[in-house]
Amino acid sequence: MHLVKDAGYAVEIEAEENIIPYIETYVNDGKLIVRYKDDVNINNRRDVTVTVALPELEEAGITGSGDITGETKFTGNDEIELEITGSGSMRLNVDAPAIEAKITGSGDMYLSGNTRDIKCSSTGSGKIDAGELKSENAVVKTMGSGNIHVFASVTVNATINGSGDITYKGGGAVSSKIHGSGSVKAVD
C-alpha cells in the first residue's frame, strides 16, 4: 500500500483483472479497510498495489503480511498511531506532536520526520527504527527479541523484558529497566 498526501480522498487498486472482484475496500468506524473477501484463497502472479490518497494521517495499521510506504511526508495536529500485527513492513515520514509505534510479531517499521513525543513498543521479534524521527522524549519498551532504535534529545525511558536491544541517539537523559539479556546503548 502506498500512501500519498492529497487534498481529497481516493483509493486506486492495481491487480490482475480476475482478482479485483475479490478485494474489498470499505470504511469502518472512520478507518479504511482493504482486504480480500472472506473464504477466498488468492493465488496471484503479481503483487496487488493499493494507492491511498488522503489529506491527513491519523493512524495506519497492518494485520498480516502487507507493506505500507508513505510516498510523501504526513503532518498531523494530534497523535499518529502506527501498528503492525504480523510480519508486515511500514516506512513513513511523519511530523506530529506525538507518535505511537507498536509491533506485535515480526514486522519492521522505519520512521523519519519530527515529533515531540514518541512511544515505541515491540512484542515478539519486530524491529522499529525511528533513528531518523527527531523526537524530544521517547518511551521505549521491548518484550521479546525485538530491537528498537530512537532519537531523543531530552529523555529516553527504556524498558526491556527479554533479549531485545534498545539503541538511542540525540543526547537525551536515559532511565532504563532491564529484565533479561537485552541492553540499552547510545549510538552515533
PLM regions: where:
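Short, ordered beta-strand-loop transition motifs
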Residues: 4-6, 26-30
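Extended, compositionally simple hydrophobic/Ser/Thr-rich segments
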Residues: 1-2, 42, 50-52, 57-188
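Solvent-exposed adhesion/ligand-recognition segments of exported proteins
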Residues: 15, 22-27
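Short carbohydrate-recognition loop motifs
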Residues: 29-37
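Short, surface-exposed polybasic-and-hydrophobic patches located at secondary-structure transitions
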Residues: 11-14, 76-77
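Start-of-domain marker
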Residues: 1-12
